């Protein structure tokens, strides 16, 4: 899998969330992702354009849940824990 020139083996959790958010939204230039290390693991904060918020969250939160599932699976392979926070 290729994430904008970064091989999957070297891609970070931040890169994964950024790739998914830019692919789903209509305004990829307004996607902002930050990663903060906490005691519990990596906290990934995602900020998107207000008009893209519904697309990122999805009906009844299904899209956000799927992104979180992918993030958790990738983090587990890295023996880490990751939490996704979607900011308004």
Report residues per predicted region.
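RNA-contacting regions in translation and RNA-metabolism proteins
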Residues: 1-53, 66-88
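An amphipathic, aromatic/His-enriched active-site/gating alpha helix that lines ligand/cofactor pockets
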Residues: 63
């Amino acid at each position: 899998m290729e994430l904008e020139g970064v091989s999957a083996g070297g891609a970070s959790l931040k890169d994964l969330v950024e790739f998914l958010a830019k692919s789903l939204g209509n305004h990829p230039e307004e996607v902002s992702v930050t990663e903060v290390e906490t005691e519990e693991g990596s906290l990934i904060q995602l900020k998107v354009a207000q008009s893209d918020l519904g697309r990122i969250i999805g009906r009844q939160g299904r899209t956000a849940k799927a992104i979180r599932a992918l993030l958790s699976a990738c983090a587990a392979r890295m023996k880490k824990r990751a939490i996704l926070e979607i900011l308004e």
